[in-house]
Every structure is written in C-alpha cells, then in structure tokens.
Swiss-Prot record:
Organism: Porphyra purpurea
PTM-bearing positions, type 4-aspartylphosphate: D53
Intrachain disulfide bonds: none
InterPro entries according to UniProt: Bact_response_regulator, CheY-like_superfamily, Sig_transdc_resp-reg_C-effctor, Sig_transdc_resp-reg_receiver, Tscrpt_reg_LuxR_C, WH-like_DNA-bd_sf
Entry keyword annotation includes Cell membrane: no
GO BP annotations, alphabetical order: phosphorelay signal transduction system; regulation of DNA-templated transcription
Keywords recorded for this protein, A-Z: Chloroplast, DNA-binding, Phosphoprotein, Plastid, Transcription, Transcription regulation, Two-component regulatory system
Domain called Response regulatory: residue spans: 4-120
Record keyword Plastid present: yes
Location relative to the cell: Plastid, Chloroplast
SMART domains assigned: HTH_LUXR, REC
Domain HTH luxR-type: residue ranges: 139-204
Designated name of the protein: Probable transcriptional regulator ycf29
Amino acid sequence: MSYNLMLVENDTVLSKAIQEYLIDQGFNVDIALNGLEAFQLANKYKFDLIISDIIMPIIDGYELLEKLRKIDKLAKIPVIFLTAKGMTKDRIKGYNMGCYGYLSKPFDPEELVSLIKNLIYRDSLNSQNLKKQNSDEIPLFQLLYLTPREKSILNLVIDGLTNKEIAVILDTSIRNVEKYVSRLLQKTNTRNRTLLVKYSIKNNLLNKI
C-alpha cells in the first residue's frame, strides 16, 4: 500500500530533494510552499501524514497545526515538524500543540523515513482497534485516566525518546521522568517501556487520554 504524504517547505531545492528521496522509499508526496497552501491541500485531498517546516511565509507551521486540529476530518493527521528551530522551548510548544514528531535540520533522511513509518503504523493500528471494540465488557484502558504530564511523557516514550531526552524537552529531572514512567507502567499493568508502547498502540490509548 502506498501512503500519501504532504511536505510543507518553502525552500524549493530542499523540498524537491526530500520529495525525491521519499518517493524512492515508496511514498506519494505532494509539496506545499507555505501553511496556507498546505491547509487548502489538506481540505481537498486525503493525506496519511504531513511533514512541515515551522518558519514559513503567510501561515507558519504552528498556525497550520492549530488550524488542522480544529477540523474534525483533519485533526488526527500525524504532523512531523522538520525545522531549524531546535530549541527545547520550540519542541515543547510543538508537542503541546499536538505534533507527533520533531526533527531538526540538518537531519538524517533515514531517520525521517523511520519516524514516518512508525507513525503511520501506529495510526493504522489505532484505526483497526477502533473497529474491533464491540464488546460489552469495559477493558482496563477505557477506565484509565492520565494527567496532562503523564500524557506528554507517554507520547514521548512512544516516539522512542530516552528518559534523559524527555527530561530535557519537558524541563524536568530524569528522576521525575522515571517516576512518571513507573506510574504509567503500573496504570497499564505492563513490565517495561516496550510493552507500554505496544499496549498503548494496541488499545488506542493515545486517543482516549
């Protein structure tokens, strides 16, 4: 199955190079030169994932993400920020607004492809699990309540970040991150981070918190 991606980048040379690389990897890729053009394309066509720069004319990446999240049919499209804005505060802002991943330029194209495949796989599993939930029994994951901080940490754990990296992004101590991860393991009745990630994806936990 070939997935449809949108690349939002006002640097035409860079956007063309990324597009060609992703096409070689088997993806369909459309290019938008700014956030406004991207928003119009998203309303017109179906995309499985959007890769967006942040600093752009007319509408920047943050504004684009905000607009997407306000429309039901577009709200769940995974968005990756691919940008030179690599400061911790910028990453925190992006994650708090609902971006699914963050890569700083210059980046390894193989890492971008791995992130894309991981997010599409996660989204595909979430969709499949939604269709299977027909039982009258209330599973554990439907009874779970996660605090905003637990939600933030769970998202970053699923993205593959280490406790140290999470601590930097959330401006907290590694010890605090360890405590939150331990609490997540207890709440989900899982033994380690790998099982926690599998449980969260399998049970569509991200869409329930």
